[in-house]
A protein has these predicted regions:
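N-terminal Rossmann-like or analogous alpha/beta NTP/dinucleotide-binding catalytic cores
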Residues: 2-11, 16-145, 297, 306-307
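Pocket-edge structural micro-motifs
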Residues: 12-14, 91, 151, 208, ...
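Short, histidine-centered active-site or binding-site loop motifs used for metal coordination
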Residues: 14-16, 51-53, 153-154, 218, ...
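Short amphipathic alpha-helical interaction patches enriched in hydrophobic/aromatic residues
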Residues: 18, 56-59, 152, 245-246, ...
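Structured ligand/cofactor/substrate-binding pocket environments in proteins
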Residues: 20-27, 44-51, 60-67, 91-98, ...
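Short amphipathic alpha-helical segments at helix-loop
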Residues: 56, 149, 153-156, 309, ...
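Short helix-capping/linker segments at secondary-structure and domain boundaries
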Residues: 111-115, 149-156, 267-277
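Conserved nucleotide- and phosphate/pyrophosphate-binding catalytic cores
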Residues: 163, 169-346
Length: 346
């Protein structure tokens, strides 16, 4: 496959339309930025904003454009290197080839394949039949196009997306077998995990219900710390976090999920190994002291992060987007033309 990129490509999506919280920061923003810094130079890093994916389930469209630009700014505030020529940031909808290739690949995809997708099953069961869109059903085909247009070999995804990587490999192999060498085959999921390595396994939980992950679905907002929260208000949320009646600090996710969550948050905010934090507090009886330490670390983190956010130059961000989109359009259009010629419409 002809590709204007001379380096192998790593591709991943930036969250488009959700208000981001500290769980997103440590679970997605920071790992993504660390990955980009670690591999830029040897690899081309494609970071795209999946705005077409963002409304496969119902959203408030009046907020979408603002959220897209805000979240892009958040990634830059977290350290995304805009000045690195190997790092490309682009909006999915600004590359028409994503949609055009999706229409083509739909005709080479079986309904049965889509019906077997566990993420579709999970989301559709929660939404109900009258709210399930064709876009949600077809999500894996668009995701395959996101990958195949640029010859991406490595795509860091969670377990919930692994099935989509395997589908991407299947459709690439199917098209290559029938029409020749059209697509670069992304590596199998096992090799993806080997390449990116295993994460440290720390997952921030809801402050009020530490048995579940921190999520925007908490309507009260008391269990979530958003990156946009007032630092002092966030510290108060920490002080009001649910704990237990055991009366002694231990790291035990089953019997003391609230205390364990606070220990994890402190480790993440201070960049200390969790074992060191646990050793410092284990066996102590003052939950208040632990909460105070976490609250102070939270306030300090948000104050610094929001200062960085305020200093992000949006003109520079928009210039980076436009430059990346120009480059990506050239690459994607070449791939699309190869496919169009192969199937006989050019």
């Amino acid at each position: 496959m002809e590709n204007k990129m001379t380096k192998k490509t790593i591709l991943t999506g930036l969250r488009a339309n959700n208000d981001l919280h500290i769980g997103n920061y440590f679970g997605a923003l920071l790992p993504l930025i660390d990955m980009a810094k670690a591999h830029a130079g040897e690899y081309q890093i494609n970071l795209f904003i999946p705005d077409l994916h963002s409304f496969t389930t119902p959203i408030d469209h009046s907020q979408l454009q603002e959220q897209i630009m805000n979240n892009t700014r958040l990634f830059v505030a977290a350290g995304l290197p805009l000045d690195n020529p190997d790092v490309h940031i682009y909006r999915q909808s600004y590359i028409p080839a994503h949609s055009e290739l999706t229409v083509i690949l739909n005709s080479f995809t079986g309904i049965g394949e889509m019906l077997r997708m566990t993420q579709f099953k999970d989301k559709s069961s929660k939404l109900g039949a009258d709210r399930v869109s064709v876009g949600l059903f077809d999500y894996p085909v668009l995701m395959a196009c996101d990958i195949l247009l640029y010859g991406a070999e490595y795509i860091p995804v969670g377990d919930d997306q692994s099935q989509h990587i395997e589908f991407t490999r299947d459709i690439a192999e199917r098209m290559n077998s029938r029409f020749g060498d059209l697509f670069v085959m992304p590596h199998e999921v096992k090799k993806q995990h080997e390449f990116f390595g295993k994460d440290q396994g720390l997952r921030i939980k809801d402050l009020q219900d530490p048995t579940k992950k921190m999520s925007k679905s908490d309507e009260s907002g008391k269990g979530i710390i958003f990156l946009s929260d007032d630092p002092k208000a966030a510290a108060k949320k920490i002080m009001g976090a649910a704990t237990d009646s055991i009366g002694k600090i231990n790291l035990n996710y089953e019997t003391q999920p609230g205390i364990s969550n606070l220990l994890q948050i402190l480790a993440l905010f201070t960049s200390e190994p969790l074992d060191n934090v646990v050793a410092r507090y284990e066996g102590k009886t003052s939950y208040g002291d632990l909460k105070m330490a976490v609250a102070e670390a939270t306030e300090a983190f948000l104050t610094e992060f929001q200062t960085n956010y305020s200093h992000v130059d949006m003109a520079t961000v928009e210039a980076k987007l436009r430059g990346s989109e120009s480059t990506m359009n050239q690459i994607a259009n070449q791939t699309l033309q190869n496919v169009q010629k192969a199937i006989g419409i050019r």
